[in-house]
Design a protein with these regions (language model features):
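Terminal and linker regions of secretory-pathway proteins
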Residues: 2-514
Length: 514
């Protein structure tokens, strides 16, 4: 899912992750291991041990572990050319009594990544239910290594999965106001695959280059959308992906590398972007929300200097980046040792079931033969969260991705950071702090901006600060996954932001027609 930081179903053993521990989204359970990582490749000791905190209940009854640690397939000579292979599709079990599949414009495809040995990236593209000249929006789920199909079926996609595995239309899908792309990335995630593990990515440079190459091929395949406004969105660990991807697109445009991509903005929902600031906010948020007591707060805060020092070593050389992951996640783990069975994605709820939420219907649905045939994915088993992709990206975890954002703001590319108020793991407080601490020409004015209500149907749905291209929105009554918890508000947020009207306080309804 999303760090969620994706939704991570991941655990560690001597060579990869073992189903003895399950990490969902950005969830970080206690982790103690010895590691060496020459050339940015991580090798975990077989002596790795994990406290039993929530481990068994996280894996019980949910079969999200793939047979392989990441999706792989034998090389196919017909796939050697870097190109898009795409088909229009209809999902079974969905009422298509309205427009035809041709009119709907639902596409599934694979892209052969040029800077790889055998990697193919899977994507879904849903043309707007409104106007074809609506903006093109790409959504990235976190993990790292978790499939964007989690968002398709549980957040902002066109459909929702019913208990009987039938599909119903999502009245607040983001395809009601945009031409919407979901990508399984990095390679090895979801239906994306490779036959060579050297294609796995270890940093945002590799991730952003792959996404940029994909966009170039996508707009070459769909030139009628190339001049539309373009926005990058996502949540959780995508707080890393999104700034790097936006910078890569902007760099490509300035260098005139290929098709000009009309990048207008990027939005990060409950993301991990500046780990040093955000990890320091854990105890403040936990104390404010009554999760820990003052004595706990004082004790856990003694870990903060060690975390800050580990992040500094990571940023200066990279050799200690896995160590910084271990050291800093001890802060979160100490809080969870006290909190017990709280749902760290929504502290109003108990963590019940596997991932604190039950997403097992999606796994069952996507592995049905009729669905796989419809999507054209052949015999590839759907992987919700790839353990090996997650492991490969650990050296990237504690990197600060905020550093590239000011240059984008100065060039007029707008940023929306939004966060549900009841999420612990990527809480609104930490996100607000890095946004306010970011140095750019409008920093002082943004810090002095009035906090105004964000209204939906005349009712306050959040609190907004905004100046120039930068906006921060604290969303009421939502946890880690805002589009799932507040679907109407999230659609209104997207529409208003893309139209430059997010700071408006009028009660006028702007949600797309039903």
């Amino acid at each position: 899912m999303e760090t969620n930081f994706g939704y991570r179903a991941m655990a560690l053993s001597s060579s990869s992750f073992s189903p003895s521990i399950f990490l969902l989204l950005l969830s970080s359970l206690p982790l103690i291991f010895s590691a060496t990582y020459p050339n940015n490749h991580l090798h975990l000791s077989s002596t790795a041990s994990f406290p039993k905190l929530q481990a068994e209940k996280l894996i019980r009854d949910l079969n999200l572990f793939p047979k392989e640690p990441f999706n792989s397939a034998a090389p196919d000579p017909s796939f050697l050319a870097p190109k898009i292979v795409e088909k229009r599709f209809n999902f079974p079990h969905l009422d298509y009594s309205g427009p035809s599949s041709e009119e709907l414009g639902h596409h599934a495809g694979y892209y052969r990544l040029p800077h790889s040995k055998a990697a193919r990236m899977f994507y879904l593209f849903f043309e707007s239910r409104n106007r074809k000249n609506d903006p093109v929006v790409i959504w990235l789920t976190g993990g790292p290594g978790c499939s964007s199909e989690l968002a398709v079926f549980y957040e902002n996609g066109p459909f929702q999965i019913a208990k009987n595995l039938s599909l119903v239309w999502n009245n607040y899908g983001w395809d009601k106001t945009s031409n919407l792309i979901f990508v399984d990335q990095p390679v090895g995630t979801g239906f994306s695959y490779t036959s060579d593990d050297e294609d796995l990515r270890h940093d945002e440079g590799g991730v952003s280059n792959d996404l940029y190459d994909f966009l170039q091929a996508f707009f070459a395949e769909h030139p009628q959308f190339a001049k539309n406004d373009f926005y990058i969105t996502g949540e959780s660990y995508a707080g890393h992906y999104i700034p790097a991807f936006a910078s890569r697109v902007h760099q490509g445009n300035k260098a005139k590398e290929g098709i000009h991509i009309n990048l207008k903005g990027f939005a990060i929902g409950n993301g991990l972007t500046n780990p040093e600031i955000q990890y320091q906010a854990y105890t403040d948020y936990a104390l404010d929300m009554g999760i820990i007591k003052k004595s706990d707060y004082d004790k856990i805060n003694k870990l903060l200097p060690q975390c800050a020092q580990a992040i500094k070593k990571c940023s200066e050389g990279g050799g200690d980046c896995v160590d910084s992951y271990v050291v800093c996640n001890n802060i979160f783990n100490q809080i969870m040792n006290i909190a017990g069975d709280i749902n760290y994605y929504d502290i109003r709820k108990k963590c019940e079931g596997d991932l604190c939420y039950d997403f097992s219907n999606m796994e069952t649905f996507l592995n049905q033969k009729t669905v796989r045939d419809s999507l054209g994915v052949g015999d590839i088993e759907f992987v919700s969260c790839s353990s090996q992709v997650y492991e490969a990206m650990l050296v990237d975890w504690m990197k600060n991705l905020e550093v590239g954002i000011p240059a984008l703001l100065e060039d007029g590319i707008k940023l929306l950071v939004y966060a549900g108020e009841y999420d612990l793991i990527c809480n609104w407080l930490g996100n607000s702090r890095w946004v306010h601490a970011m140095e750019w020409s409008g920093q002082k004015q943004f810090g002095a901006s009035a906090t105004v209500p964000f209204l939906v149907d005349g009712a306050e749905a959040g609190l907004l600060n905004s100046h120039g291209p930068l906006s921060f929105l604290k969303v009421h009554d939502a946890g880690h996954m805002v589009p799932m918890d507040q679907p109407k508000a999230s659609l209104e947020m997207l529409m208003s932001w893309m139209q430059g009207k997010l700071a408006m306080t009028e009660t006028k309804e702007r949600v797309a027609p039903q």
